[in-house]
């Protein structure tokens, strides 16, 4: 008589069977359990492109891929130059449009799913560092695409396992995004772990780099201290200004952000408070004219 399967083996068997059948039914979250947070400074053996131009977006958004792949040239070594050889990376299919919205730390994908029909002409990407959680969102999106094939829904959203604290500029060009969502990030309560918070002076500069002027960073948390931290760091950054409360509450995406994430629903169930703040990317200052000319 065989031994009963442990929980990990049951999870692996479930996910393997789901994918073998083509992922036509929505995945069950209990088979994708993982720790609530991951250390962003650990070596997660992540795969990332050297430059945004070398990112294979077509595998994430196949319905927006152009027909002909584009061959990517790579740097040649001295020996290859002497023999006249030129290496080429595998051909990459480009997209008909760029990703413009990023959900950093997308969790189980609640916000992605809610944004898909609201922003039907916009490509939205969820970024998540945890392996099992990323797999859940992948399977969830695949199932929703199959179930809504006639309506052509959920083709504009995707998820990518990535560490945005290290590699965000590897995926996005300067000024590519017009919206960034940071929803219920890990608060890292201990002072010695504040350097792991997803909002900091350094990271805000990276957000400013990938966000076009006029673009918005959306933040929400149920931790007052973290809310004050994020507000303080964005207010102190010269590339951002806080959006007024009136404009914030008039933005329909704020209500979606409040109510559609899994963490937001949990806060609602426990009658907790949700602290929201939006920040607009300012225009870069002009270079001073050369008075010596």
Curated annotation (Swiss-Prot):
Compartments where located = Nucleus
Q: In which pathway does it act?
A: tRNA modification; N(7)-methylguanine-tRNA biosynthesis
Does Mitochondrion show up as a keyword for this record? no
Q: Which segments of the protein form a coiled coil according to its record? A: none
* Binding residue positions for S-adenosyl-L-methionine: 105, 128-129, 163-164, 183, 261-263
Listed EC numbers: 2.1.1.33
Pfam families in alphabetical order: Methyltransf_4
Q: Which reaction does it catalyse?
A: guanosine(46) in tRNA + S-adenosyl-L-methionine = N(7)-methylguanosine(46) in tRNA + S-adenosyl-L-homocysteine
> Catalytic site residues?
186
State the superkingdom.
Eukaryota
Q: What are the GO BP annotations of this UniProt entry?
A: RNA (guanine-N7)-methylation; tRNA methylation
Does rRNA processing appear among the keywords? Answer: no
Enzyme class, spelled out: transferase
Please give the Gene Ontology molecular function terms for this protein.
tRNA (guanine(46)-N7)-methyltransferase activity; tRNA binding
Q: Which InterPro entries does the entry mention?
A: SAM-dependent_MTases_sf, Trm8_euk, tRNA_(Gua-N-7)_MeTrfase_Trmb
Q: Which GO terms describe its cellular component?
A: nucleus; tRNA methyltransferase complex
* Keywords from the UniProt entry: Methyltransferase, Nucleus, RNA-binding, S-adenosyl-L-methionine, Transferase, tRNA processing, tRNA-binding
- Kindly state the subunit structure of this protein: Forms a complex with trm82.
- What is the similarity comment for this entry? Belongs to the class I-like SAM-binding methyltransferase superfamily. TrmB family.
Q: What does this protein do?
A: Catalyzes the formation of N(7)-methylguanine at position 46 (m7G46) in tRNA.
**Protein known as:** tRNA (guanine-N(7)-)-methyltransferase
The gene name reads trm8
């Amino acid at each position: 008589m065989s031994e009963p399967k442990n929980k990990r083996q049951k999870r692996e068997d479930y996910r393997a069977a789901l994918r073998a059948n083509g992922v036509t039914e929505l995945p069950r979250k209990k088979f994708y359990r993982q720790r609530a947070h991951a250390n962003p400074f650990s070596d997660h053996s992540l795969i990332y492109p050297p430059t945004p131009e070398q990112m294979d977006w077509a595998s994430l958004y196949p319905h927006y891929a152009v027909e002909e792949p584009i061959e990517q040239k790579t740097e040649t070594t001295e020996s290859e130059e002497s023999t006249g050889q030129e290496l080429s990376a595998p051909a990459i299919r480009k997209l008909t449009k760029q990703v413009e919205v990023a959900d950093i730390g997308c969790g189980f994908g609640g916000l992605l799913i809610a944004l898909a029909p609201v922003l039907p002409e916009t490509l939205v990407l969820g970024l998540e560092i945890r392996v099992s959680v990323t797999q859940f969102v992948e399977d969830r999106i695949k199932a929703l695409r199959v179930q809504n094939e006639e309506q052509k829904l959920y083709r504009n959203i995707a998820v990518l396992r990535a560490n945005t604290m290290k590699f965000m500029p590897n995926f996005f060009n300067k000024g590519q995004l017009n919206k960034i969502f940071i929803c219920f990030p890990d608060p890292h309560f201990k002072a010695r772990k504040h350097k792991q918070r997803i909002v900091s002076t350094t990271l805000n500069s990276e957000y400013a780099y990938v966000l076009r002027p006029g673009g918005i960073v959306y933040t929400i948390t149920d931790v007052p201290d973290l809310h004050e931290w994020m507000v303080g760091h964005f207010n102190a950054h010269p590339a951002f200004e806080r959006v007024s409360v009136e404009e914030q509450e008039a933005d329909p995406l704020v209500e979606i952000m409040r109510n559609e994430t899994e963490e937001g629903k949990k806060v609602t169930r426990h009658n907790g408070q949700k602290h929201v703040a939006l920040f607009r990317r300012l225009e870069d200052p002009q270079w001073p004219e050369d008075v010596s000319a």
